Amino acid sequence: MKDYVAFDLETTGLSPDSDQIIEIGAVKIRDGKISGKYNCIIHPEIEVSDFIINLTGISRDMLRKGIPLKEGVEEFLEFSGDLPILGHNVMF
């Protein structure tokens, strides 16, 4: 596969039931080379622990200025277009 989008998420924790996405990062690969980048910080609806702040390097100020999840997902999908989407470290 020569053309695709690889993405990675940062979250408030590991629970799909109670934790939330706080960052979406992606690169678009065309002909084996990076042809575009996308990154957004998501404003979470829950408090983020000091552990996650330190682990991700995403500050509380950055989170306060983040965009809503729906907006971030819409932007990511627009960035991705019709390319296959591959997740990074999706097994955790």
Place the predicted regions along the sequence by residue.
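Conserved non-catalytic scaffold segment of RNase H-like nuclease domains
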Residues: 1-92
